Amino acid sequence: MQHFFYKLILSYDGTCYYGYQKQPQKITVQQTFEKALKKMTHQNIPTFAASRTDKGVHSQGQTLHFQTTFFLKPTHFQKTLNYLLPPDIRVRQMNFATPNFHARYSAKSKIYQYVFSKKPLNAFNHHFQIFADKLYFDKITKALKFIEGTHNFFAFTSETQPKNFSKTIFQAFLKETSHKYILVFHGNGFLKYMIRFLVGSLIEIGKNKLSLEQFQAMLLGNTTKKATLLAPSKALVLKKIFY
């Protein structure tokens, strides 16, 4: 029986979901997507994603792949899935994939963004950003440069026994618009809670609660101090996956 391989880009508002990955008794993005996929194909089809985003984290560029004996042109597949999915999950793009493509293991790098509002939050934006209340962004900009390069990020994760705490950050910078400050992180991979702990430390730097020297020592492994402030998940967005 012939199998067909599909790759798609998924965007979602993570507010109402208990993260991306399936969990018992929890409503997640993966569970919701696979439910729509089963309704369409009448098959139990496992899907594989590039990133397992946390509860409340959003995506504009999550990448998935799956295989099935069900055939439909990707454009028609995309249209039908979007009809079956809730409005806070959208298939942005869908194509055929090669049999050796893997959404997670074929990924070369990822971009995440963390969004601060310059003004107090309102009813229409409070799910997607946090208020930049009395933060010194000149200090945060200096600290971002320390993050670039290959480091042991043990101080910035809840994990205790991964194979390797080393990650390479190609770019870490601040982007400013008329209404927002956006922290951009482009790296070859990220540990559990790594970006949120980094952002939490940057917030502490911006409030003069953590020095640049202390932050750099944490990145260099010259201290036993670990990050303690976990930034809220709602302002974090998975922007893009590179292959």
UniProtKB/Swiss-Prot annotation:
Residues annotated as binding substrate: 112
Alphabetical list of InterPro entries matching this protein: PsdUridine_synth_cat_dom_sf, PsdUridine_synth_TruA, PsdUridine_synth_TruA_a/b_dom, PsdUridine_synth_TruA_C, TruA/RsuA/RluB/E/F_N
Pfam families linked to this entry: PseudoU_synth_1
Recorded catalytic activity of this chain's protein: uridine(38/39/40) in tRNA = pseudouridine(38/39/40) in tRNA
Superkingdom in the source lineage: Bacteria
Keyword tRNA processing: yes
BP-aspect Gene Ontology terms: tRNA pseudouridine synthesis
Active-site residues, record numbering mapped to chain: 54 (nucleophile)
Residues of the signal peptide: none
Entry's EC annotation: 5.4.99.12
UniProt keyword list: Isomerase, tRNA processing
Transmembrane parts of this sequence: none
One GO MF term attached to the UniProt entry: tRNA pseudouridine(38-40) synthase activity
Presence of keyword Hydrolase: no
Summary of subunit composition and partner proteins: Homodimer.
PANTHER family in the cross-refs: PSEUDOURIDYLATE SYNTHASE, TRNA PSEUDOURIDINE SYNTHASE-LIKE 1
Task of the protein: Formation of pseudouridine at positions 38, 39 and 40 in the anticodon stem and loop of transfer RNAs.
Family (UniProt): Belongs to the tRNA pseudouridine synthase TruA family.
Name assigned to this protein: tRNA pseudouridine synthase A
Organism of derivation: Onion yellows phytoplasma (strain OY-M)
